[in-house]
A protein has these predicted regions:
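Terminal substrate-recognition subdomain of acyl/acetyltransferases
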Residues: 2, 118, 133, 137, ...
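A short beta-loop-alpha structural element at the N-terminal edge
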Residues: 10-24
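Conserved GNAT-fold acetyl-CoA-binding loop/helix
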Residues: 27-52
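A short helix-loop-beta-strand connector motif used in the catalytic cores of GNAT acetyltransferases and
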Residues: 50-64, 158-161
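Conserved beta-strand in the GNAT
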Residues: 64, 70-78, 85-90
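A short, internal acetyl-CoA/4′-phosphopantetheine-binding micro-motif in the GNAT/acyltransferase core
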Residues: 89-96, 120-122
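Conserved acetyl-CoA-binding loop-helix of GNAT-fold acetyltransferases
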Residues: 91, 97-110, 133
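Conserved beta-strand-loop-alpha-helix junction that forms the acyl-donor binding cleft
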Residues: 118-128, 144-149
């Protein structure tokens, strides 16, 4: 009926006009990193408009989870040579623990026929557990370093303080 709120949940690409909301979601959820990741790696905002634009220009495609007509979670993918990277996976704090992130990652895995890699902060134990619950395997430090150097455009400090998880795992 007109005027009623939708009770359906929807997985879809994030629309251009939702990029400001995407930043709100990313920066709100990234607050969990404050005090957990090395102090010299934290900055405010965690992601700026400029950084989001750069990520999109570099090929990151954002998918969103809409709950009752409201975007509450985002997760990006980026095709890099022979793999797909999971990039910038964030859910509004008030919606965490409700299956939003799990639905997003399952959807992105369904869309990809290639190995998927995700990098996150080594100190973000909650993020590592999330990816492990969704069949990603934490890789050894030597392999992590090689993959971060090969597939991501990040500085040495971030390489030193990050981990990589893979699905399917490397043998």
């Amino acid at each position: 009926m007109p005027g009623e709120k939708s009770t359906t949940n929807l997985l879809r690409r994030v629309r251009e006009e939702e990029l400001p909301l995407t930043l709100v979601i990313i920066n709100a959820a990234a607050e969990m990193y404050r005090g957990a990741i090395p102090r010299d790696c934290w900055h405010e905002p965690y992601m700026s408009d400029r950084e989001l634009d750069e990520e999109i220009r570099a090929g990151v495609e954002f998918w969103g989870y809409e709950q009752q007509g409201r975007l509450v979670g985002v997760m990006g993918t980026q095709a890099v040579r022979d793999v797909d990277l999971i990039r910038h996976a964030y859910v509004l704090p008030s919606c965490q623990g409700q299956g939003v992130g799990g639905a997003l990652i399952a959807h992105l895995r369904d869309l990809s026929a290639r190995r998927m890699l995700v990098g996150t902060w080594a100190a973000a134990s909650w993020a590592i557990r999330f990816y492990e619950r969704h069949s990603f395997q934490l890789l050894e430090p030597e392999m992590t370093r090689r993959l971060l150097q090969a597939y991501w455009r990040i500085g040495e400090r971030q390489i030193e303080t990050s981990v990589v998880l893979a699905n399917p795992p490397y043998q």
